[in-house]
Amino acid sequence: MPVTDPIADYITRIRNAGVAKHKTTDIPHSKLKERLTVLLEEKGYIKSHTVVQGEKFPVIRVHLKYDMYGKPVIKEIKRVSKPGRRSYEGKDIRKYLGGLGLYILSTSKGLLTDKEARSLGVGGEVLFSIL
């Protein structure tokens, strides 16, 4: 069955794996998903990732990160801009929860966090929020 919203599928797979306390989760590969994974890794929300050949197609194997109590580092991850209701922010992007979390934006400069987009003075589509 085809996925109508690949970013929502990506978010759901990461959220479900964290709740189930899995060490890794496999996500169907695409360039966008790989860039999102690299961004989450840079910001410390996941341990690492590798691209491996699945049964038919390549997959991104995401190694999840947990705190010292065994709880997932990703407390909350939500899709903001959806296929039926797109959400855009201008260059004066608001902070997510007063700066505790991040917005991930798709901008003309590539995928950026809200802080990076504010410093570059660009806006874009708010893909999801993460805490």
Curated annotation (Swiss-Prot):
InterPro entries: Ribosomal_uS8 (IPR000630), Ribosomal_uS8_CS (IPR047863), Ribosomal_uS8_sf (IPR035987). The keyword RNA-binding applies. Gene3D superfamilies: 3.30.1370.30, 3.30.1490.10. It holds the Pfam family Ribosomal_S8. One of its GO terms (cellular component) is ribonucleoprotein complex. GO terms for biological process: translation. This is Small ribosomal subunit protein uS8. It comes from Chloroherpeton thalassium (strain ATCC 35110 / GB-78). The gene is rpsH.
